[in-house]
């Protein structure tokens, strides 16, 4: 039987989808080459209302395909499944299986049971029984991998529904994490992203407050690992030893995603964020003093209940002061069951939209100005999979700088995703750069793995290492 997994939401869900694919293939399922398959799995998000609406809209489209016989079974997992549970069957009775965030490994059995009994099956567990790292994983990338170090969150942000869906923080032991990274590197992986809801509280479960900084140093020392990243930290628990580890460990990239949410102390207090703007600015200052070329990115919520124009101006002022390389900006979305959803002074949509556009205008201007500083500089890029399938055959490539910026460039030689190329930046836009023809190229084991996974024609093109003849 064939399967496909559609993913909504954050990096946690992306990695969970790799696990879902892994457990299905372990049971003999084969990945479909299209959006249609015998089994369609929707791995959902519950953070914002528009994600809910999009999901239920897509479910309606799947009904027609199921009636036409193009799909046999539909399974729904992820945070929305954990939240809505039986409501999914009420809204979409054509769904066959609903499973939660704590029991990904149960999916094959639930699918079998549903086919055998010809009934809908649901299994939602409220607690994580075993860490999901024990499940098989089907990774899409040959050069980059997620490695989960913790699941769940102990924070109580008033706008966030995630802790009630993912549970309290559970930490993996350092030895298990390092063993997984070593195994990945032996398979050709060059870049690892350590993943957790709040990575810098890693170690709280086994009583080691310096565990995350220590993990960065040990992971960065693994031979063959060229790039090490992490997401996401929390300003309240972020400490100097993590910045020191970033500075001292060559493999750790000069990039830091530090969620701000608001520049107003009053709103941060209402959000129950456990830090204030001064603490945030101190972290940024220390990071830039020790790592001058670091790129800082962030998350910002616009229109939180009770946000005044003065509060919003505090956010604009802080954004102007910090000068983020990029920012994920969101309009506040009330989530039922969170304290913020029942707060007074919910902000009208037109005001939220107007503020959101002002913030975007400011951040886009800053991002462009910061990117223009790179024009004329040489940067080493990790070649990534581009958006167009034919781009590599036309000698057009996409890569990421060490600080995470996206660069489009050309190269006379055939490159593989996972190779490195050094280019000179010749043009800047707010959220991408353009490089001249590659100056140097460095082949990697990750590129070799990509060749093994792709067709013979591509392999012949690449292995010559010569310019294409037109």
UniProtKB/Swiss-Prot annotation:
Protein residues bound to [4Fe-4S] cluster 1: 10, 45, 79
Quaternary structure (record): Monomer.
The TRAM domain, residue ranges: 372-439
Pfam name, any one: Radical_SAM
Alphabetized SMART domains for the sequence: Elp3
Family matches, as NCBIfam families: miaB-methiolase (TIGR01574), MiaB/RimO family radical SAM methylthiotransferase (TIGR00089)
Top-level taxon of origin: Bacteria
Cofactor(s) demanded: [4Fe-4S] cluster
EC number(s) given by UniProt: 2.8.4.3
Species assigned in the record: Tropheryma whipplei (strain Twist)
Name listed for the protein in its UniProt record: tRNA-2-methylthio-N(6)-dimethylallyladenosine synthase
Membrane spanning stretches: none
